[in-house]
């Protein structure tokens, strides 16, 4: 049975990747269908109730700069906002928000329901329709066929998902949801490498059974940050505190005593878990010298008693979970309302993807999110937006686009995945980016919004707001550069008390701001120098561009050198055995990875600069030198 309408893009899955993919394709004018097994769980925060953090917040800002929904939903759902690394340089500062699960889900669903060109339909997908190595549609569990020349798969942890609690296990996509078994079997028939990964979640605790007086209160920041460039503090709901407590030796003894019934340590779980978000049993095993581990007690919302104890993800048996929870200070009488569990699921080797996130073997089929081996809402959302956008571009007969590593953390994420692959759930950190001084949270819109507008991702309201901000920054920078103060100026006696060394020669306002003891708001408050910019985000941008101009210029010069060969394309059908001078190891790795560009090839482990030089000479001789899109 065929559905009565044909679509341009079909998105399978309604999590963070799927929602951003569907919204992106629809914003670009493509007739888009979002299929999900349950409309009520669209935008569900399946694990921790938080958005952002180190590296992750940078991705959220980039999604937002390209017109995505994640940051906007966070501003409407965030019940505590903090700027992490606030005392450090701007490159590593990151916004993190504790979110009300229900409010976040409601806002995402509201955005989806009001997006033109987007249809939503409740059905799980069991099969792909592939003809001559091109996807042409999908078939749902009730046999209903939907047709489209582009399909984006965002299946999360649902592909052959298996939930583990102690030595008991059962099939599931997440707690309370069925897995995607038929679709997983269908995907395993495709010529794409497949593996198993695992992730986990902690038990949820009844807040009424916690003694918060025995814990350390953690309040949000004042003034309140916002997540979206279109956001406003007035969008935030009521703000509340989180709390901090710790495990202890008794906790660790309880965990050690239960390891014989742990699915991880008894060989039941085969999948590899996230290195940077380990289970509590993994922490006790790997860091046996530590006598305690920090636990963040995080509310799941304003109208629920459920608490998320961040730091004790576990798949131990329920009786062990209860005992370990009750061994922690402040939780001696705690009651568990949902047990913690681990989930194992299929993922597909992202080296089998182009940097557009289209599979190399099936035209029109795109993967995004945990199916590519990543972990985290933010990583999923970023991939979803990129995959949905490129699916729409393909249908419209346009070239695919992916930002370079020096342009966005999204570019770092996709390049790492498609070039290096991953054997464990991949999460983003600022340390993964070579050019992080240029890839800051604060300038994500300056880096990406103009490109988003060109691609059709950015609407008129966002574009008007961005253009106004950009103009105000440029005018203020011009003012600071063009206005000067002389040693005999009447402003000097007013200014000197604020300086470490008095004015002895003429200086521009820009030079004054560059002094380490001066900041923009302080300078603008001095008579004769203001009033300056009222928009705090624009003012911050002016300060950073002035203070870090030398460092930024040097990093830009490094980028210009690196980019020369970065986008030199490599034919996907190139047999590296035919390239004289390459070692057998290099040939094997290049034939296995099939990099799309010289830049990707250079980042494969074991590919030497000499091998890259040989490749460039070969391409030039054969007339194959070309720039990738």
Swiss-Prot record:
<feature type="binding site">
    <location>
        <begin position="13"/>
        <end position="18"/>
    </location>
    <ligand>
        <name>FAD</name>
    </ligand>
</feature>
<dbReference type="InterPro" id="IPR044920">
    <property type="entry name" value="MnmG_C_subdom_sf"/>
</dbReference>
<comment type="function">
    <text>NAD-binding protein involved in the addition of a carboxymethylaminomethyl (cmnm) group at the wobble position (U34) of certain tRNAs, forming tRNA-cmnm(5)s(2)U34.</text>
</comment>
<dbReference type="InterPro" id="IPR002218">
    <property type="entry name" value="MnmG-rel"/>
</dbReference>
<feature type="binding site">
    <location>
        <begin position="273"/>
        <end position="287"/>
    </location>
    <ligand>
        <name>NAD(+)</name>
    </ligand>
</feature>
<feature type="binding site">
    <location>
        <position position="180"/>
    </location>
    <ligand>
        <name>FAD</name>
    </ligand>
</feature>
<dbReference type="GO" id="GO:0050660">
    <property type="term" value="F:flavin adenine dinucleotide binding"/>
</dbReference>
<protein>
    <recommendedName>
        <fullName>tRNA uridine 5-carboxymethylaminomethyl modification enzyme MnmG</fullName>
    </recommendedName>
</protein>
<dbReference type="Pfam" id="PF13932">
    <property type="entry name" value="SAM_GIDA_C"/>
</dbReference>
<dbReference type="GO" id="GO:0030488">
    <property type="term" value="P:tRNA methylation"/>
</dbReference>
<dbReference type="GO" id="GO:0002098">
    <property type="term" value="P:tRNA wobble uridine modification"/>
</dbReference>
<keyword id="KW-0520">NAD</keyword>
<keyword id="KW-0274">FAD</keyword>
<feature type="binding site">
    <location>
        <position position="125"/>
    </location>
    <ligand>
        <name>FAD</name>
    </ligand>
</feature>
<keyword id="KW-0819">tRNA processing</keyword>
<comment type="similarity">
    <text>Belongs to the MnmG family.</text>
</comment>
<keyword id="KW-0963">Cytoplasm</keyword>
<dbReference type="InterPro" id="IPR004416">
    <property type="entry name" value="MnmG"/>
</dbReference>
<comment type="subunit">
    <text>Homodimer. Heterotetramer of two MnmE and two MnmG subunits.</text>
</comment>
<dbReference type="InterPro" id="IPR040131">
    <property type="entry name" value="MnmG_N"/>
</dbReference>
<keyword id="KW-0285">Flavoprotein</keyword>
<dbReference type="Pfam" id="PF21680">
    <property type="entry name" value="GIDA_C_1st"/>
</dbReference>
<dbReference type="InterPro" id="IPR049312">
    <property type="entry name" value="GIDA_C_N"/>
</dbReference>
<dbReference type="Pfam" id="PF01134">
    <property type="entry name" value="GIDA"/>
</dbReference>
<dbReference type="InterPro" id="IPR047001">
    <property type="entry name" value="MnmG_C_subdom"/>
</dbReference>
<dbReference type="InterPro" id="IPR020595">
    <property type="entry name" value="MnmG-rel_CS"/>
</dbReference>
<feature type="binding site">
    <location>
        <position position="370"/>
    </location>
    <ligand>
        <name>FAD</name>
    </ligand>
</feature>
<dbReference type="InterPro" id="IPR036188">
    <property type="entry name" value="FAD/NAD-bd_sf"/>
</dbReference>
<dbReference type="InterPro" id="IPR026904">
    <property type="entry name" value="MnmG_C"/>
</dbReference>
<dbReference type="GO" id="GO:0005829">
    <property type="term" value="C:cytosol"/>
</dbReference>
């Amino acid at each position: 049975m065929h559905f009565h309408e044909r679509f341009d893009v079909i998105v399978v899955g309604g999590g963070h990747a799927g929602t951003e993919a569907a919204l992106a394709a629809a914003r670009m004018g493509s007739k888009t269908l979002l299929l999900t097994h349950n409309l009520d769980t669209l935008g569900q925060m399946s694990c921790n109730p938080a958005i952002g953090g180190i590296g992750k917040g940078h991705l959220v800002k980039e999604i937002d700069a390209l017109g995505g929904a994640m940051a906007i939903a966070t501003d409407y759902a965030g019940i505590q906002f903090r700027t992490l690394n606030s005392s450090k340089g701007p490159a590593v500062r990151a916004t993190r928000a504790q979110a009300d699960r229900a409010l976040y889900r409601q806002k995402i669903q509201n955005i989806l329901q009001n997006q033109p060109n987007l249809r939503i339909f409740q059905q799980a997908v069991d099969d792909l329709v592939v003809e001559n190595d091109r996807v042409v549609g999908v078939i749902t569990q009730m046999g209903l066929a939907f047709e489209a020349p582009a399909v984006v798969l965002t299946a999360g942890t649902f592909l052959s998902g298996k939930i583990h609690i102690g030595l008991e296990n059962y099939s599931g996509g997440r707690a309370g949801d069925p897995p995607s078994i038929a679709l997983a079997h269908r995907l395993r028939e495709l010529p794409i490498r497949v593996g198993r990964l695992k992730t986990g979640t902690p038990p949820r605790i009844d807040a009424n059974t916690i003694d918060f007086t025995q814990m350390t209160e953690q309040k949000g920041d004042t003034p309140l940050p916002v997540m979206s460039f279109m956001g406003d503090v007035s969008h935030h709901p009521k703000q509340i505190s989180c709390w901090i407590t710790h495990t202890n030796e008794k906790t660790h003894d309880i965990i050690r005593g239960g390891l014989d019934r742990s699915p991880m340590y008894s060989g039941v779980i085969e999948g590899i878990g996230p290195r940077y978000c380990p289970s509590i049993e993994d922490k006790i095993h790997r860091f046996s010298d530590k006598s305690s581990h920090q636990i963040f007690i995080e509310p799941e919302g304003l109208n629920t008693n459920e608490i998320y104890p961040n730091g004790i993800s576990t798949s131990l048996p329920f009786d062990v979970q209860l005992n370990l929870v009750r061994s922690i200070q402040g939780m001696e009488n705690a009651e568990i309302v949902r047990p913690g569990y681990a989930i194992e699921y299929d993922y597909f080797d992202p080296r089998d993807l182009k940097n557009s996130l289209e599979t190399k073997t099936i035209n029109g089929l795109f993967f995004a999110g945990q199916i590519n081996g990543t972990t985290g809402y933010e990583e999923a959302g970023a991939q979803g937006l990129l995959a949905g956008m490129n699916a729409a571009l393909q249908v419209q007969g346009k070239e695919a686009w992916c930002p370079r590593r020096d342009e966005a953390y999204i570019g770092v994420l996709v390049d790492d995945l498609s070039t290096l692959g991953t054997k464990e759930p991949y999460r983003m950190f600022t340390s993964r980016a070579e050019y992080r001084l240029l890839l800051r949270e604060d300038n994500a819109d300056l880096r990406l919004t103009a490109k988003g507008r060109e691609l059709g991702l950015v609407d008129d309201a966002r574009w008007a707001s961005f253009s106004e901000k950009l103009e105000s920054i440029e005018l203020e920078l011009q003012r600071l550069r063009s206005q000067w103060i002389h040693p005999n100026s009447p402003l000097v006696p007013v200014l000197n008390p604020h300086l470490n060394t008095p004015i002895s020669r003429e200086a521009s306002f820009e030079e004054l701001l560059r002094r380490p003891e001066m900041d923009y708001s302080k300078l603008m408050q001095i008579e004769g120098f203001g009033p300056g910019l009222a928009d705090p985000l624009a003012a911050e941008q002016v300060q950073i561009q002035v203070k870090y101009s030398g460092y930024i210029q040097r990093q830009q010069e490094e980028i210009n050198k690196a980019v020369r060969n970065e986008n030199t394309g490599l034919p996907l059908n190139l047999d590296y055995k035919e390239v004289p001078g390459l070692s057998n190891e290099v040939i094997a790795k290049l034939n296995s990875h099939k990099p799309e560009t010289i830049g990707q090839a250079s980042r494969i482990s074991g590919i030497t600069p000499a091998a890259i030089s040989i490749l460039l000479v070969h391409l030039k001789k054969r007339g194959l030198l070309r720039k990738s899109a």
